[in-house]
Every structure is written in structure tokens, then in C-alpha cells.
A protein has these predicted regions:
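C-terminal binding/interaction regions
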Residues: 31-106
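A general structural motif
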Residues: 2-3, 29-33
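Glycine-rich phosphate-binding loop
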Residues: 1-25
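Glycine-/small-residue-rich active-site loops that bind phosphorylated ligands and cofactors
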Residues: 5, 28, 55
Length: 106
């Protein structure tokens, strides 16, 4: 559930379904901090999983992680996706290590 100016919105589905609800605070006023704080401060009994501001990708990955608990094929796809993410980080670090500067940086 994306939440910008109506950051209290995730409580509606969270209060009326036993299914997990993921709140995504969207950057609006106060750099999204108002939305983030509104989502993480849900009342007792109305849990909402919350990701970072503008964290729709992480919300999607979290949803797939939940769904993959009962689906081996989906779990395999998620594992491969995460391996790809790890490879991108390793590759980026290797490229960054090759950058040389003519002046001292530390």
C-alpha cells in the first residue's frame, strides 16, 4: 500500500484482513518522514510491515519472500534474483576498486 499524504491508509486493509499488509511511505512533505512515522506507529493489533521511503522495490521483494514460503518454484526464482543482485554489487565494487586518482584521497 503506497502511502504519501494519506500515510494512515495502510490501517484500512490491515484492520480488515488477516493477510499481511506492506506499507510503502512515499516522499511528499517532510521528505517522507511523516508518512514513514505514520505507518510504523500503527495501533496494537493492526500490524503493517513497513519498508523505506519510496521502497516499492523492497516491498515487492518482501511480498515475494512471503509468497515463496508456500511455493518452491517462486522460492527458486527469488533465490536466483538475489544471486543476481549480489553479483551486481560485487561487479560494482570491482569497478570502483579500479578507479585511480592522481591525488591522495585519504
Amino acid at each position: 500500500t503506497p502511502a504519501g499524504k494519506a500515510a494512515h491508509f495502510p490501517w484500512l486493509p490491515a484492520a480488515s484482513t488477516p493477510l499481511p499488509v506492506i506499507g510503502v511511505p512515499i516522499n511528499s512533505t517532510l521528505d517522507g518522514m511523516d508518512a514513514l512515522l505514520a505507518i510504523v506507529q500503527m495501533p496494537p493489533g493492526i500490524p503493517v510491515a513497513t519498508v523505506g521511503i519510496n521502497g516499492a522495490l523492497n516491498a515487492a521483494i518482501l511480498a515475494v519472500q512471503m509468497l515463496s514460503l508456500g511455493d518452491e518454484q517462486l522460492a527458486g526464482k527469488l533465490k536466483n534474483y538475489k544471486k543476481g543482485l549480489a553479483k551486481k554489487i560485487v561487479d560494482a565494487n570491482e569497478k570502483l576498486a579500479q578507479v585511480k586518482y592522481a591525488f591522495k584521497t585519504n
